[in-house]
Amino acid sequence: MRHGKVHRKFNRTAEHRKAMFANLAGALITHEQIVTTLPKAKDLRPVVEKLVTLARRGDLHARRQAIAELRDLNVVKKLFDVLAKRYEGRPGGYTRIIKAGFRYGDSTPVAVIEFVDRDVDAKGAADRARAEAAEAVAA
């Protein structure tokens, strides 16, 4: 019986799952909107919600816990400096999942997971900065 089993295994080891969700959470925090499979989006939501709640707390221990979870200092910096201030008045529900049809190759249900009140310019900002830096070096 599956009683009390909250999370899916995704046919991965525990370490692989932890790394996968750290990468997905980092991508979501960086871009504020990502497209992934529906089951991954549903399992990613509580991970990100807990990280934003940690960031709202804002103390040193919370920052270290977020670093241990995400393993990327730039993502943690954005989480604590930008997102924590944006959601300080909201008691939860920082993300939304929007169903986006089915993937062409294998008909897997796909979803968009994004932050509520997201910054629209955040998606692709790193790519634009990288392209501008490459143009500056080339010129």
UniProtKB/Swiss-Prot annotation:
Keyword Ribonucleoprotein on entry: yes
Organism of provenance: Azorhizobium caulinodans (strain ATCC 43989 / DSM 5975 / JCM 20966 / LMG 6465 / NBRC 14845 / NCIMB 13405 / ORS 571)
Listed GO biological process terms: translation
GO cellular component, one term: cytosolic large ribosomal subunit
UniProt protein name: Large ribosomal subunit protein bL17
Keywords, alphabetical: Ribonucleoprotein, Ribosomal protein
Subunit structure: Part of the 50S ribosomal subunit. Contacts protein L32.
GO molecular function: structural constituent of ribosome
Pfam families assigned to the protein according to its UniProt record, in alphabetical order: Ribosomal_L17
Species lineage: Bacteria, Pseudomonadati, Pseudomonadota, Alphaproteobacteria, Hyphomicrobiales
Record PROSITE patterns: RIBOSOMAL_L17
